[in-house]
């Protein structure tokens, strides 16, 4: 092994992420870089080249971070190896951004020339600064008629404190400015500084399951080298494996003889169980292990919980296996078994937000061919019990009776909303409607304001983002972080069908909204549940108190059609007999609840509740 050659190779590596607010053109810039460096041929090139998940292409967003090795011949006559990592822009997937930054020395900070700095631009920049990365400002979409690159540079300097005087102006659509950007990567982003001669130390930043090769680990090599035949150890479990293949993504897998300190690539080692590795673990040399593991990642707790059940109970084991495989590729997903009297055996799943929940459900249905029922999402509540202990409630049906606890606390967030001056009024009105508490308002420039509210997380996760976009014509952007738990006047509302509580339909609401929400829920269920041969009573209740009710009338068979019209006694007798039969049927009949009903609570927006 020629160390001098390997060190020279290492000096020509550049590892960088592309970070930005959603829709500011990260994936388009990545496409142009792949095109200009001939990493993919013109025939193979397609939009969102690095978004290889079908769902990403359907939705037009990046969900998973993706890495690719790019070879670039610079103007100084030397060849460089770029490891480009594309990252998501949506707030739900910020954990993907933090993981990708840990594998880099630099970041391209992309800002839309027509929109300027947005909420996620700020959030992602702070992540990059925390990781001590070299940040290269990039002004994108300069081809748009509404583009104002100078204003975007001013905002970067004023709001982020970065020098934007030599920011690269590009158009991801036309390719203008991309050659200058490639040169900037060479000159401004430092080479990795890992020690090639030290024992192997590599960080697992992603992984996926392959039916033929087992678990494929995506790694950043911090120190040392790794090649096929080497014995490696995963430090968290102590388990040892023999490496069968190493390589890089370019953007399709390309085998290599060796990966060295600074490389970003993949390792396979006949790891058959998805439980044996975890994102954030450190890999080392089994014969000469490193003394200390790498710091890994801060585990981000779920924000939203929902029940997930197979439509056919026989698919329970398939769902469990699918969730385990998905968790390997989605470190933020959490799940544990749960049982519902209405839905049978399933799992209580934790997600980072509603988009994350939708994505997981769609991936399970598309990639694993499962039919699923999801219950309405809920946040984590804390019930302070009479004996002083705290019970964590992630399922509304688990909230104890009112006499058993002193108070219920719910999570609060600090919400930062960037909005044009013209829309400050509607935004403040929306926040107050969602039980928000005004904190402060900062004028960023003469056009935009940063409005800060303390708000219950439960109000944010449902339709707040959609309401915000519609009340500001799409111009507002949102970022939020959990600040802690507060005691509020919350109650559990049970939904009863023919006096039987349906656990999967229970929900928690603020007392001031409880009756309206219960009324809305019962009337919505009346529309969704098909008519039966017997009467169905739908009730909303807080404890023993019924606060709303709706009735689904039964089908009625004409039992009097044979009778002569002049025989009222016989007619009354037959109708009474029918009534007694229906009463018996109602007592023993099971009401079939359609899948739509379990998500009905999501459709209860403010206008519905207020009866507008």
UniProtKB/Swiss-Prot annotation:
Residues 11-193 form the tr-type G domain. Its EC number is 3.6.5.n1. Its main location: membrane. GO terms for biological process: positive regulation of translation. PROSITE patterns: G_TR_2 (PS51722). Gene3D superfamilies: 3.30.70.240, Elongation factor 4, C-terminal domain, Elongation Factor G (Translational Gtpase), domain 3, P-loop containing nucleotide triphosphate hydrolases, Translation factors. Keywords: Cell membrane, GTP-binding, Hydrolase, Membrane, Nucleotide-binding, Protein biosynthesis. It catalyses: GTP + H2O = GDP + phosphate + H(+). GTP binds at residues 23-28, 140-143. It comes from the Bacteria. It is an enzyme of class 3 (hydrolase). GO terms for molecular function: GTP binding; GTPase activity; ribosome binding; translation elongation factor activity. PANTHER family: TRANSLATION FACTOR GUF1 HOMOLOG, CHLOROPLASTIC, TRANSLATION FACTOR GUF1-RELATED. Belongs to the TRAFAC class translation factor GTPase superfamily. Classic translation factor GTPase family. LepA subfamily. Required for accurate and efficient protein synthesis under certain stress conditions. May act as a fidelity factor of the translation reaction, by catalyzing a one-codon backward translocation of tRNAs on improperly translocated ribosomes. Back-translocation proceeds from a post-translocation (POST) complex to a pre-translocation (PRE) complex, thus giving elongation factor G a second chance to translocate the tRNAs correctly. Binds to ribosomes in a GTP-dependent manner. This is Elongation factor 4. It comes from Lactobacillus acidophilus (strain ATCC 700396 / NCK56 / N2 / NCFM). The gene is lepA.
């Amino acid at each position: 092994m020629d160390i001098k050659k390997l060190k020279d190779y290492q000096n020509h590596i550049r590892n960088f992420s592309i970070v930005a607010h959603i829709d500011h053109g990260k994936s388009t810039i990545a496409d142009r870089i792949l095109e200009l460096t001939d990493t993919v041929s013109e025939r193979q090139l397609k939009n969102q080249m690095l978004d290889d998940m079908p769902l990403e292409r359907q939705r037009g967003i990046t969900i998973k971070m993706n890495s690719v090795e790019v070879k670039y011949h610079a103007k100084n006559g030397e060849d460089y190896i770029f490891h480009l990592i594309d990252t998501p822009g949506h707030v739900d997937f910020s954990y993907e951004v933090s993981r990708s930054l840990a594998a880099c020395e630099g970041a391209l900070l992309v800002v839309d020339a027509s929109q300027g700095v947005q909420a996620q631009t700020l959030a992602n920049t702070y992540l990059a600064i925390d990781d001590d990365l070299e940040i290269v400002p990039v002004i994108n979409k300069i081809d748009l008629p509404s583009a104002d690159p100078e204003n975007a540079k001013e905002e970067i300097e004023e709001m982020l404190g970065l020098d934007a005087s030599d920011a690269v102006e590009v158009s991801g659509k036309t390719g203008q400015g991309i050659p200058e950007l490639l040169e900037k990567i060479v000159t401004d982003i430092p080479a990795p500084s890992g020690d090639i001669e030290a024992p192997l130390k590599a960080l697992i930043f992603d992984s996926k399951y392959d039916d033929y090769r087992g678990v494929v680990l995506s790694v950043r090599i911090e120190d040392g080298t790794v090649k096929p035949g080497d014995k490696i150890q995963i430090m968290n479990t102590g388990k040892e494996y023999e490496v069968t293949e190493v390589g890089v993504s370019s953007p399709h897998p390309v085998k290599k003889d060796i990966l060295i300190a600074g490389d970003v690539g993949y390792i396979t080692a006949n790891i058959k169980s998805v439980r044996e590795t975890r994102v954030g673990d450190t890999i080392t040399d089994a014969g000469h292990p490193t003394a200390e593991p790498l710091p890994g990642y801060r585990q981000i707790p779920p924000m939203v919980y929902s029940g997930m059940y197979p439509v056919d109970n026989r698919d329970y084991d398939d769902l469990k296996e699918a969730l385990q495989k998905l968790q390997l590729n989605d470190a933020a997903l959490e799940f544990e078994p749960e049982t519902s009297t209405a839905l049978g055996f399933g799992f209580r799943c934790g997600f980072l937000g509603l988009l994350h929940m939708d994505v997981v459900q769609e991936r399970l249905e598309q990639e694993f061919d499962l039919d699923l029922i999801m219950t309405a999402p809920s946040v984590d509540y804390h019930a302070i019990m009479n004996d002083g202990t705290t019970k964590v409630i992630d399922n509304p049906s688990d909230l104890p009776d009112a006499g058993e606890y002193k108070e219920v606390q719910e999570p609060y967030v600090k919400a930062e909303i960037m909005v044009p001056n013209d829309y400050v009024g509607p935004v403040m009105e929306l926040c107050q409607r969602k039980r928000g508490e005004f904190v402060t308002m900062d004028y960023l420039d003469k056009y935009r304001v940063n409005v800060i509210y303390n708000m219950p997380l439960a109000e944010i996760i449902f339709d707040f983002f959609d309401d915000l976009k519609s009340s500001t014509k799409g111009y507002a952007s949102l970022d939020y972080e959990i600040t802690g738990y507060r005691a509020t006047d919350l109650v559990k509302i049970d939904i009863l069908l023919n006096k039987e509580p349906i656990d999967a339909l229970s929900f928690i609401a603020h007392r001031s909204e409880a009756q309206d929400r219960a009324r809305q829920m019962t009337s919505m269920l009346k529309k969704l549940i098909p008519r039966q041969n017997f009467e169905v009573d739908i009730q909303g209740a807080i404890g023993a108190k019924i606060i709303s009710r709706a009735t689904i009338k039964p089908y009625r068979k004409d039992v009097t059609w044979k009778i002569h019209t002049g025989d009222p006694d016989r007619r009354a007798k037959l109708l009474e007999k029918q009534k007694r039969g229906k009463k018996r049927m109602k007592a023993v009949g099971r009401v079939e609840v359609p899948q739509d009903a379990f998500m009905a609570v999501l459709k209860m927006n403010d206008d519905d509740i207020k009866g507008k």
